[in-house]
Amino acid sequence: MSNGIDKVVLAYSGGLDTSIILKWLQDEYQCEVVAFCADLGQAEELEPARAKAEKFGVKEIYIDDLKEEFVRDFVFPMYRANTLYEGVYHLGTSIARPLIAKRQIEIANATGAQAVSHGATGKGNDQVRFELGYYALRPDIRVIAPWREWDLTSRDKLFAYAEKHGIPVPTDKRGEVPYSMDRNLLHISFEGKALEDPWVEPDEEMFVLSVSPEKAPDQATYVELTFRQGDLVAIDDQEMSPATLLAKLNQLGGRNGIGRLDLVENRYVGMKSRGVYETPGGTILGVAHRAMESLTLDREVAHMKDELMPRYAKLIYNGYWFSPERAMLQTMIDASQTFVNGKVRVKLYKGNVVVVGRQSENSLFDPAIATFEDDKGAYNQADADGFIKLNALRMRIAAMLRNGPKV
């Protein structure tokens, strides 16, 4: 069943699902498979994935370190918008997919592949995110989505296929099949198993990046974050690369019990799903960036950003990173960050990120006007009388017309 496909680039992790897919592609499509593994900060040794692919005769294997590109070109632009999906989710999975799709298409072009493939299920958002990216970057690309084609429709069938072809089935330290997890430098997500009941509290042993707030230190940690045009550039006055900065924030946040999130979200494909997330560094970054904006952004610009943020977040969540509307919003967001420069001091304590200071050469905060003390005439309080009456005019007119003049 080649269908004119001689070569396919598979987004390959070395895990159970994509290892099964690799073998299935070889058997069903009788084509050459190019294995591509993206290092986005999974904190895993990726060379075993190479060995697994080689075991199945794969000749072209790409293991690419994309951590800096991921944070610089995807995570940081997203955080300039203070992006949260449905008010809480930091989009750690969503924002990784366009970069993987981009690199897959680049490899397909370089190797002469006619198709790309991924391991996303037919029930989830990732199939949409991957494939919208593929088609935006190469309209004629062929897409193979095994979960929408094969008859391996249950875990038991997957395990039987794996056993038949000598593919090891991973287990946790209890000897059980682990949660469905996705990890990168921004977050780790957990789905499936007991979490499919939204009433069940997650097992503490499940968490990877953070201690529980109850077990976090009793002493607060103070951190200073430096921003330049909306992007984090230094921690405690030490400049680092984007990926190194986020990794450092993950360490600081994780040890202080920061960044855990348990939510039921609305998937693009129409169903609700329950996920548990750890985003320690991203949580700190989001709080600090908003604090920096509070000092440096014009009021109406800040409010407009807040109005547009849910739309921007939905575009990323649904897979429209490469769409013209996301690019348009990004241009506006980036323009708003010109003066978002300075420092924010935060206190990290038992799951909380508390802003305790902010300063900027571009500050719009004028203490001479805002003071409760004598402002030496900088602000004439009597001017407020006309301001209030003009703003009340429409409501006064409506009240008079509806209620009639008093006799």
From Swiss-Prot:
Q: Which residues bind L-aspartate?
A: T121, N125, D126
Tell me the residue numbers annotated for binding L-citrulline: Y89, S94, N125, R129, S180, S189, E265, Y277
Molecular function as annotated in GO? argininosuccinate synthase activity; ATP binding
Catalytic function, reaction form:
L-citrulline + L-aspartate + ATP = 2-(N(omega)-L-arginino)succinate + AMP + diphosphate + H(+)
EC number of the protein: 6.3.4.5
Q: What does the subunit comment say? A: Homotetramer.
Note the PANTHER family from the entry: ARGININOSUCCINATE SYNTHASE
Name this protein carries in UniProt: Argininosuccinate synthase
The source organism is Magnetococcus marinus (strain ATCC BAA-1437 / JCM 17883 / MC-1)
Q: Tell me the organism's taxonomic lineage.
A: Bacteria, Pseudomonadati, Pseudomonadota, Alphaproteobacteria, Magnetococcales
